Design a protein with these regions (language model features):
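Metallocofactor- and cofactor-centric catalytic cores in central/energy metabolism, strongly enriched
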Residues: 1-220, 224-236, 250-258, 351-435
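Short glycine/serine/threonine/alanine-rich loop segments
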Residues: 213-214, 239, 265-266
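Conserved anion/nucleotide-ligand pocket segment
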Residues: 242-244, 248-314
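A generic structural signal for short, non-catalytic loop/turn and secondary-structure boundary residues
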Residues: 71-73, 157, 261, 333-335, ...
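Glycine-rich, aromatic-lined ligand/substrate-binding cores of catalytic
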Residues: 297-386
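Short flexible/disordered coil segments
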Residues: 222-237, 275-287, 304-313, 331-344, ...
Length: 435
């Protein structure tokens, strides 16, 4: 075991969530209830998973907190921004994800979490009509106001550290443009000239977070930190960034099931994925411009697992389609349908059907906990820039596409990356030995 330079998790950890909707309030409520011993954080890898460290007679399986210094749940303080002014208790009740018995015991704590005014541009989320928004003339003004919010929150709550995580709606698609997104100088210039076409509000949150010494996590498929200019800023500020798009349901299944097809060298003719969703996320995604952002994210999984360049006979002509349908009666209870057309020996066709009846926010909440705790850990370990070891939590993991890097989407390879990062930060050797 090697000596490490990971700083201890001393003092309070502020978690500032962009968005105070179903996902955010389910996350907050679960953490607060867990602290009181009234529920368990099921689904959280940082709270439940064990990793093997050592080999032979020295082999043992330890929880993450016994390998690396994770922040304690009792030390977490929540803050949030939202376009709607309702406090976290009101928002949790409105979301109808959790039952009253799971909200009322922490009512006072949730009521104390009041959203700050959001940096918002309705052109990026046309289905939202909240008025709890900042009056900013330019994108740069948004950055300055958000920086002040982080400074004030940190001071007011006595936080040693703050992590900012996006759990708000998907913005309309902003394609990467080398003329605006390549360098930090370009990004600064675009923000200060109020270039609203190329600078999304989410970029202002990321910029403010990084410049205030806070790791930033993009939980939606927004472009935001997935551009070289933001990587440069993360390097300059020595802060971790992670993204994008929480991997909760259908894509989680896809990233775990596609490796089965690949491992057995079965052919894949097509994969049709659709789901129905009735919460505010579904409402926003009913807008074509916003759905396109999500579509790009969800379509990226298969091609890096079942590779046409490696096995053209098996994967050279895959038809991959993804659809999301807004269906209000289901609210947060998302249902995913997958039809997978495969072929085997001598080209004979077969089919696989998957029907996943899930709860969107219940699956997402533990990801917020894990991503924030591990990003805070990464910052204290001196890790900055893109945190590829967090890919297991994300639909479209960030990678340096300017250097020809490809995302790792295979769930089992992602798990190895996560375990090895924890091992290394804990002073143990990384390895790929089968557990």
């Amino acid at each position: 075991m090697k000596q490490t330079n990971v700083k201890p998790a001393e003092g309070r950890l502020g978690i500032m969530v962009v968005g105070c909707g179903a996902v955010a309030t389910t996350f907050m409520t679960g953490v607060l209830m867990t602290r009181k011993g009234l529920t368990k954080p099921i689904g959280s890898m940082t709270q439940y998973d064990k990793i093997r460290v050592g080999r032979g007679a020295d082999k043992k399986y330890l929880h993450y907190k016994d390998i690396v210094p994770l922040a304690n749940l009792d030390d977490i303080v929540f803050g949030t921004w939202d376009v709607y002014p309702q406090n976290a208790y009101q928002a949790a009740v409105y979301a109808e994800v959790l039952k009253a018995k799971d909200i009322e015991p922490v009512r006072e704590e949730l009521m104390a979490i009041k959203p700050l005014k959001a940096a918002f541009d309705r052109n990026y989320a046309k289905r939202l009509d909240g008025d709890n928004v900042k009056d900013c003339k330019t994108r740069w003004d948004m950055v300055v106001e958000l920086q002040k919010d982080i400074q004030n929150f940190k001071k007011e709550h006595g936080c040693e550290r703050v992590v900012v995580i996006w759990a708000a709606s998907t913005e309309i698609y902003v394609p990467y443009d080398e003329a605006y997104h390549m360098t930090l100088e370009q990004l600064d210039s675009a923000m200060k000239s109020d270039d609203r076409e190329h600078i999304a509000p989410s970029m202002c949150y990321a910029y403010a977070a990084l410049t205030e010494g806070c790791p930033f996590i993009m939980g939606a498929p927004n472009t935001t930190v997935d551009i070289p200019a933001m990587w440069e800023l993360a390097e300059k500020t020595r802060m971790p960034i992670a993204g994008k798009d929480f991997k909760t349901g259908q894509t989680l299944v896809k990233s775990g099931f596609a490796p089965i097809i690949k491992t057995r060298n079965l052919g894949l003719a097509g994969w049709f994925s659709t789901n129905i969703l009735g919460n505010r996320d579904g409402l926003v995604l009913d807008e074509p411009g916003n759905f396109h952002t999500k579509e790009v994210s969800k379509l990226s999984t298969l091609e890096t697992i079942c590779r046409a360049d490696e096995q053209p006979d098996l994967y050279g002509n895959i038809y991959h389609k993804v659809r999301i349908n807004y269906y209000p009666p289901r609210n947060d209870d998302k249902e995913g349908w997958d039809n997978i057309d495969i072929f085997g020996w001598m080209g004979y066709p077969m089919q696989i059907k998957i029907n996943f009846l899930c709860r969107d926010s219940i699956l997402a909440a533990p990801l917020l906990l894990d991503l924030t705790l591990l990003s805070d850990l990464a910052a204290r370990a001196g890790r900055y820039g893109i945190q590829r070891f967090l890919s297991i939590f994300l639909k479209s993991p960030m990678h340096d596409f300017t250097r020809g890097e490809e995302a790792v989407n295979n769930l089992f390879e992602q798990y190895t990356m996560l375990k090895n990062a924890i091992r290394e930060m804990g002073g143990y050797e990384a390895d790929e030995e089968i557990d």
